[in-house]
Amino acid sequence: MPKYKVIAHRRVHKFISDLKDENLKSTVKDALSKLENYPLALKEMDIEKIKGLEKTFRIRIGKYRIIFYVDGTEKIIYVTHAETRKKIYKK
């Protein structure tokens, strides 16, 4: 099965670097690396499609959410946002 390339926006990299909890930081990094195995990652992690947005999904890690878009033709996953649940759905 071909792997997907995961590209994260710089605000996602900033979010990860600003996390104080090292366990949470490694959990987020692991989740992003597991996305390379999309669509198998859908079964391994808490991933759901975002209603109203085509090919856009969210990963839930505790109170945090990671939003990503899947380009199936190019085999690329664009990670666009990462933030607390309270802040992420206001965007």
PLM region spans:
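A short, surface-exposed loop/turn module that caps and links secondary-structure elements
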Residues: 33-58
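Enriched for short, Lys/Arg-rich terminal
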Residues: 2-5, 10, 16-17, 22, ...
